[in-house]
From Swiss-Prot:
CDD domains membership: KPHMT-like
Function: Catalyzes the reversible reaction in which hydroxymethyl group from 5,10-methylenetetrahydrofolate is transferred onto alpha-ketoisovalerate to form ketopantoate.
Organism: Maricaulis maris (strain MCS10)
Annotated InterPro entries: Pantoate_hydroxy_MeTrfase, Pyrv/PenolPyrv_kinase-like_dom, Pyrv_kinase-like_dom_sf
Gene: panB
Record protein name field: 3-methyl-2-oxobutanoate hydroxymethyltransferase
Active site: residue positions: E191
NCBIfam families, sorted: panB, PRK00311.1
Length: 279
C-alpha cells in the first residue's frame, strides 16, 4: 500500500453551522480544490474547500466557466471528498444548472450532494436568486452565495472587472448581499469589490463574508489554489503568490529529461534485482 492510499485519522468534519458561527471571529481560511491529492494537502489548513467551476479554466483549459457541466462538477467533487477529511467541502453549481427555477436548482443541488457527499453548494446570487436560495435552504441544502464580480455573468456584465465603483453598481452589490443573506445562505463570497464596500457588507449581513479580491475587511479569504502557488504566468491583482510552482516544476522536468537522455536515470537505486537463490 502506498503512502498516498493510507487513510488519515478521521477528524470531525466542519459543517455549515460551524462556518456561520465564525461570523466576526477568527478569519475563515478557504481555497479551491479539484482533485484528491491536492485536497489532502490543503485539508489540515483550511476551514472550507471549494470545488469551484473555475476548474473549467484551471484544469480543463476552457476560456470561461460557462462551458462547465454538472457532470464535471460532480466528478471533481467526488475526487475532493476522497482527499478531504476535515474541511467543509462546497461544490459550485455551474452555469445553467440553477437559473431556470428553484425546482431545477434543488433537483440539481440534491444530485450534487447525493453523488459527491459534499456539505454545501455555492451559486452566484444576484437578487434574482433569492427565491432559489430560500427554496433550497428550506429543503436542507446548505447554500453559499456569491456576489460582486460573478464569473458566470461576466459576458453579460462587461467582462472580468471590479464591481461597485459607481453608486448604482455599489447599491446593486449591497442589495445582492442583503437578499442573499435574508434568503438563507450561510455564507457569502464577495468578489472584486473595493475595501469600503466589502466592509459595509460585512458589517451589515449576519453571515460570514469570504473575500476574493475584496480586502481583509471580510470574515475570511479564498483564492484559486493554483494562482496562489504560481502555476500560471499571469497573476490577478488580488493574489499573493506564495510559491512559483511553474518554475520549479519546469526545472524538475528538465532535470528528469536530462537524466533520461544521458541514461543516469534509472540508476541502480531505482532498478529491481532478482532475489538470491536459497540453494
Amino acid at each position: 500500500m502506498s503512502a498516498q492510499s493510507k487513510s488519515p485519522t478521521k477528524a470531525r468534519r466542519i459543517t455549515a453551522p460551524d462556518i456561520r458561527a465564525r461570523k466576526g471571529g477568527e478569519p475563515l481560511v478557504c481555497l479551491t480544490a479539484y482533485d484528491a491529492p491536492m485536497a489532502r494537502i490543503l485539508d489540515p489548513h483550511c476551514d472550507l474547500l471549494l470545488v469551484g467551476d473555475s476548474v473549467g479554466m484551471v484544469v480543463h483549459g476552457l476560456d470561461s466557466t460557462v462551458g462547465v457541466t454538472l457532470d464535471m462538477m460532480i466528478l471533481h467533487g467526488q475526487a475532493v471528498m476522497r482527499g478531504a477529511r476535515q474541511a467543509l467541502v462546497a461544490v459550485d453549481m455551474p452555469f445553467g444548472s440553477y437559473e431556470q427555477s428553484p425546482e431545477q436548482a434543488f433537483a440539481n443541488a440534491a444530485r450534487v450532494m447525493a453523488e459527491t457527499g459534499c456539505q454545501a453548494i455555492k451559486i452566484e446570487s444576484g437578487t434574482y436568486a433569492a427565491d432559489t436560495i430560500r427554496f433550497m435552504a428550506a429543503r436542507s441544502i446548505p447554500v453559499i452565495g456569491h456576489i460582486g464580480l460573478r464569473p458566470q455573468a461576466a459576458l453579460a456584465d462587461g467582462g472580468f472587472r471590479a464591481k461597485g465603483r459607481t453608486q448604482a453598481e455599489r447599491q446593486r452589490v449591497i442589495d445582492e448581499a442583503l437578499a442573499t443573506a435574508e434568503a438563507g445562505a450561510f455564507a457569502i463570497v464577495i468578489e472584486g469589490v473595493a475595501e469600503d464596500l466589502a466592509r459595509e457588507i460585512t458589517e451589515t449581513v449576519d453571515v460570514p463574508t469570504i473575500g476574493i479580491g475584496a480586502s481583509a475587511a471580510c470574515d475570511g479569504q479564498i483564492l484559486v489554489t493554483q494562482d496562489m502557488l504560481g502555476v500560471f504566468d499571469w497573476t490577478p491583482k488580488f493574489v499573493k503568490r506564495y510559491d512559483n510552482m511553474a518554475e520549479r516544476t519546469d526545472a524538475a522536468v528538465a532535470q528528469f529529461a536530462s537524466d533520461v537522455r544521458d541514461r543516469s536515470f534509472p540508476s541502480q537505486r531505482e532498478v529491481y534485482t532478482m532475489k538470491r537463490s536459497d540453494g
